């Protein structure tokens, strides 16, 4: 049975998946979902395939999950695509990862435009290869007027780096007399982050069974709900995302209260 491993779907054997989707949509849908897409390499290794095969398969899942998140009326979907630490990986793998945005957007951009999806990128883009930057810039330019789901790629992104950069810019504004020490607040610091125009993630998902944050949106996930799964990213499905959201809907978010 499709939903046997999904606790909130138990007892609904005669219910279609589409009906379950509509039931979940009656509840509160997180405005911003962030996903640490982990496990591509291990997925490939288990199948005696090269690691890049796992990344290619993971790209197909991005397409599927983006469409489904849009269907659920999620406002922002942030995907951790490449961290500042990932440069330590073998050059062949890094080179392939830098080609993925071109491949992904080359085939999927028309559908993103049709789905009214807006593409954005956070991260230090100056270190990215020119062909990678151009692919992302083209997608952002061609979707900038779209008003549906914001598909936000974290590419060459590290949260500590982001926070340091934000503080540096704030100090520069202080030197220029634009900021006073007494004006500094959480809201002000947030305004200097790469996500300043976005709501903080309400739900953080990590695949592959790892229980860590990996330098991802450390400031922004202060009050996020976490959802971990042992499933590798290439095996992640719409059912998994629906289950994560259903779990989210059953939690009591107190934000430090009682």
From Swiss-Prot:
Per the UniProt record, the source organism is Bacillus cereus (strain ATCC 10987 / NRS 248)
Its quaternary structure?
Homodimer.
Cellular component GO terms held in the UniProt record? cytosol
- Does Cell inner membrane appear among the keywords? no
Under Pfam families, the record lists: Prenyltransf
- PROSITE patterns assigned: UPP_SYNTHASE
Keywords per UniProt: Magnesium, Metal-binding, Transferase
Q: Return the EC number.
A: 2.5.1.-
Q: What is the main EC category here?
A: transferase
NCBIfam families linked to this entry: PRK14830.1 (NF011405), uppS (TIGR00055)
Q: Which CDD domains match?
A: Cis_IPPS
Q: Does the keyword Acetylation apply?
A: no
Binding residues for substrate, per the UniProt record? Answer: 39-43, 51, 55, 83-85, 87, 89, 206, 212-214
Active-site annotation: 38, 86 (proton acceptor)
PANTHER family per UniProt = DEHYDRODOLICHYL DIPHOSPHATE SYNTHASE 2 (PTHR10291:SF0), DEHYDRODOLICHYL DIPHOSPHATE SYNTHASE FAMILY MEMBER (PTHR10291)
Co-factor(s): Mg(2+)
Q: What is this protein called?
A: Isoprenyl transferase
Q: Which GO terms describe its biological process?
A: polyprenol biosynthetic process
Q: What is the stated purpose of this protein? A: Catalyzes the condensation of isopentenyl diphosphate (IPP) with allylic pyrophosphates generating different type of terpenoids.
Per UniProt, Mg(2+) binds at 38, 225
* Similarity section: Belongs to the UPP synthase family.
According to the record, how does the cofactor bind? Binds 2 magnesium ions per subunit.
């Amino acid at each position: 049975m499709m939903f046997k491993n999904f606790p909130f779907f138990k007892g609904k054997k005669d219910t279609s998946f589409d009906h379950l989707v509509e039931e979940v949509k009656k509840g509160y849908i997180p405005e911003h979902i962030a996903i640490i897409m982990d496990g591509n390499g291990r997925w490939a290794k288990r199948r005696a395939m090269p690691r890049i095969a796992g990344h290619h398969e993971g790209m197909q899942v991005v397409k599927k999950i983006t469409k489904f998140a849009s269907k659920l009326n999620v406002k922002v979907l942030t995907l951790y695509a490449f961290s500042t630490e990932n440069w330590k990986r073998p050059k062949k793998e890094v080179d392939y990862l830098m080609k993925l945005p071109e491949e992904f957007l080359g085939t999927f951009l028309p559908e993103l435009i049709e789905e009214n999806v807006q593409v954005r990128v956070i991260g230090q883009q100056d270190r990215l290869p020119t062909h990678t930057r151009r692919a992302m810039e083209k997608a952002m330019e061609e979707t900038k007027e779209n008003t549906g789901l914001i598909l936000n790629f974290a590419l060459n992104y590290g949260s500590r780096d982001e926070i340091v950069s934000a503080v540096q810019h704030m100090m520069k504004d202080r030197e220029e007399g634009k900021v006073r020490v007494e004006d500094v607040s959480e809201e002000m610091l947030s305004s200097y982050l790469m996500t300043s125009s976005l709501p903080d993630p309400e739900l953080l998902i990590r695949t592959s069974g790892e229980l860590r944050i990996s330098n991802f949106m450390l400031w922004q996930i202060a009050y996020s709900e976490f959802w971990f799964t042992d499933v590798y990213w290439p095996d992640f499905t719409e059912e998994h995302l629906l289950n994560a959201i259903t779990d989210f809907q059953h939690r009591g978010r107190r934000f430090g209260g009682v």
